[in-house]
Amino acid sequence: MKKWRSRVTTDGLDRAPHRAFMRAMGLDDAALAKPMIGVVSMKGEQTPCNMTHDFQVDAAKSGIAEAGGTPREFTTVSVSDGISMNHEGMKFSLFSRELIADSIEAVVHGLAYDALIGFGGCDKTLPGVIMGMIRCNVPSIFIYGGSALPGRFDGRTLTVLDSYEAVGGFMTGDIDEATLEGIERSCLPTIGACAGQFTANTMAMVSEAMGVTMANVSMIPGVFAERAQVARQAGRLVMQMLQRDGPLPREIVTRKALENGAAIVAATGGSTNAALHLPAIANEAGIVFTIDDVGEVFARTPLIGNLRPGGKYTAKDVFDIGGTAVVIRALIESGHIDGASLTITGRTIAEEYGNANPPDGEVIHSTHTPIMRDGGVAVLKGNLCPDGAVIKVAGLKSVLFEGRARVFEDEEACVDAVRKQDYSAGEVLVIRNEGPVGGPGMREMLGVTALIYGQGMGEKVALITDGRFSGATRGMCIGYVSPEAFVGGPLALVRDGDLIRIDAGARRMNLLVDERELAARRQAWKPRPPRHRAGALAKYARLVGQAPRGAVTHEGPAEWPWFD
């Protein structure tokens, strides 16, 4: 009989106290003799995104027990991007990704669990769980809790993005208060993650393309009973993986798997946050996969998903035509996804997705007749972003913009100007000191971008920041500018009135200021004092790196000995 690593907590005379703790939790001799399988989720009342976890966790535990394991449930943190948006609380969003991975490592290794099922829901929980799985490198399955159903109001299909943009529309008088309230009350009719191809659904598709979850499950709505069946099957499957010693997360998450993940982001016009999360996931596997690598995949992958925010449809629409499998099969056949990559079943991506439906031509287009020949997301370079910046080009009417800079030292200053409509068409709004170190925490800017779009100015101005954007952001918005202003990146040298040229088609962004003038500004530049001197964010600011490597807090894979 295989000796599970959990035996270090259960076997032997000197483990009597350990067993006493477990017996106090209701475990009998039979349960103590079985492998211990961790089941982590974020179930709670922080956000509707994770409230679908309750019944799915129960189903996963049942599947584990049926297959001969002892499930051990635990929870970790989640910071709602929606509720923390546009205030200081957003500084904890990206930080929570690291906290999730760290807490999974602490529990799985601290209690010597043999395998893991990890649920994700709200945006940062997905990469956080996947990073934790790879770090622990025990047999693991990721499960997305599923998205909310779209809402309906006044004959329109809604997502939560409509409520953000409606605020801007009300400010300009384009809609009345009754319409604003109607959208607010209708846009999120169920629990589950945001319904568009925002960060959660993007990373859910990435999990399929990388092979770390079960095939074609990510687009099943979070409130559908089918999700319980998926979770139960996952419980059985993780026990099979344990019995055959894998495949382990680091055997699945290879460079090709990461390229597959980047390809599905580009093909669906997914969240720009994926350009941050993929390098961070790679880091846990010991792979250097930077924003440059992500950008190369983005550039060669066609946009075939007509999905919000750049397109028309939601995750439920993708589910209705056959799920993520439709996208993956199309990309395998066109050579944009490597079908030989491994999945958690031990089978290849091509084997798992070979029988998928073809594209319907409306929600998902064929790669032969794509919406755009280049991907829906692009990585830019230039003297304003020598290490990279990211823009979502899906849905843009023009990928070229040139205008004069209007500089804001933080998000609040820009939001105040936009609320007062104190800005003009043709301007380039620059929000700086919002990077991973300077924020700290690299806040998302959906609040301000949605106000701009709702005011009808979405493509009449550009916005550049060293902060992040929500997956729901649309318009001429460039984020993740690196190096960030706080550490002396070129963004710190921009002044009001400077001319900036953005050419997303050529993947370039440049500050059109004489080099001698920039050298003089750099000589005069002085670093700003840190915003936090104590607490979690202060620790984070001391550890976190820059965006091109994923804004991670450590480099390389963690090592932990298997117990003999």
What are these regions (language model features)?
Residues 93-102:
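Glycine-rich, highly charged phosphate/nucleotide-binding loops
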Residues 107-129, 141-144:
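A short, small-residue-rich loop immediately preceding and capping a beta-strand
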Residues 64, 103-107:
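Glycine-rich, N-terminal phosphate-binding loop and its surrounding beta-alpha-beta segment
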Residues 1-45, 49-51, 57-77, 82-83, ...:
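Catalytic or ion-coupling anion/metal-binding cores of large enzyme and transporter domains
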